[in-house]
């Protein structure tokens, strides 16, 4: 499982993100893609220098062996399986500024002013979790970023695109429409007994939308319109490995 922990040393078995594609080169070059959402152990020459051992904790998985004479051929075949990338808009190729975190609009303005004074072109500024109301997805803190739609438009006139973060965990809070819809419709990941799995990330206790389900992807995806209607035209999808700080019942 993934772990949102910056200290990834030899004693840390969990990576920050899971990418279940590996390309091996030796007497034969080939790729392996494992289509499985749960725990996988990768031992790449660690126990035995010339051996790779992959251990999958489960039975319901697919393994793709991708043959090819050159790495580029293998990568192209892999992308055919998972889907090719879309072509980003031109402005997305410009210089982008991000950090954790800009606490209010004034902090963003100061960064933009700094770039202008230094004569450095800037196209995008990323908004981390502090733009949200108590770290709730698809909300804006009106005290920190008042008149957000107008602010987005003002920055656009300055040539700056604002890219807000969206986390995979939906805050458990009565009256919060995103959470209420997810709970009512059974959109969150479940425990073995059918109850909602609950874990902790930035907002506290959250539910995790089950993105393996097309109906959940469609539901969650429709919520981005809340921000696109305010002029936002790019997003930073984060914590979607999923990252988790702790769980209520513990992880087995």
Feature locations, PLM:
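An acidic, carboxylate-rich microenvironment
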Residues: 73, 106-107, 150, 215
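Catalytic domains of carbohydrate-active enzymes, especially glycoside hydrolases
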Residues: 17, 81, 107-130, 151, ...
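Glycine-rich, histidine-containing beta strand-loop boundary motifs that form or position
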Residues: 25, 33-36, 44, 67, ...
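Aromatic- and carboxylate-enriched substrate-binding clefts and catalytic-loop regions
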Residues: 121-252
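Catalytic and substrate-binding clefts that recognize carbohydrates or anionic sugar/phosphate headgroups
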Residues: 1-89, 99-100, 105, 112-117
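Short, acidic/polar
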Residues: 103-118, 216-226
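N-terminal small/glycine-rich loop or linker at the start of catalytic domains
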Residues: 81-98, 195-208
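Structural beta-strand/beta-sheet cores of well-ordered domains, especially the beta-sheet scaffolds
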Residues: 17-19, 28-30, 52, 59-62, ...
């Amino acid at each position: 499982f993934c772990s949102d922990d910056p200290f990834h040393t030899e004693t840390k078995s969990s990576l920050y993100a899971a990418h279940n594609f590996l390309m091996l080169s030796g007497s034969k070059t080939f790729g392996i893609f494992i289509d499985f959402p749960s725990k996988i152990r990768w031992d790449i020459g660690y126990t035995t220098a010339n051996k790779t051992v992959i251990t999958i904790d489960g039975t319901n998985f697919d393994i793709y062996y991708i043959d090819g004479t050159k790495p580029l051929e293998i990568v192209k075949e892999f992308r055919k399986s998972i889907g090719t990338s879309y072509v980003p808009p031109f402005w997305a190729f410009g210089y982008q500024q991000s950090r954790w975190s800009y606490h209010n609009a004034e902090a963003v303005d100061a960064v933009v002013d700094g770039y202008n004074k230094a004569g450095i072109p800037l196209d995008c500024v990323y908004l981390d979790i502090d733009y949200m109301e108590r770290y709730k997805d698809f909300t804006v803190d009106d005290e920190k970023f008042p008149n957000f739609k107008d602010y987005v438009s003002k920055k656009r006139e300055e040539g700056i695109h604002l890219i807000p973060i969206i986390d995979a965990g939906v805050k458990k809070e009565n009256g919060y429409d995103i959470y209420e819809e997810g709970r009512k419709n059974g959109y969150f990941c479940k425990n073995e007994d059918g109850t909602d799995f609950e874990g902790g990330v930035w907002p506290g206790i959250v539910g995790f939308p089950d993105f393996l389900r097309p109906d959940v992807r469609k539901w969650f995806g429709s919520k981005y319109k809340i921000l696109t209607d305010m002029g936002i035209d790019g997003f930073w999808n984060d914590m979607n490995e999923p990252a988790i700080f702790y769980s209520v019942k513990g992880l087995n």
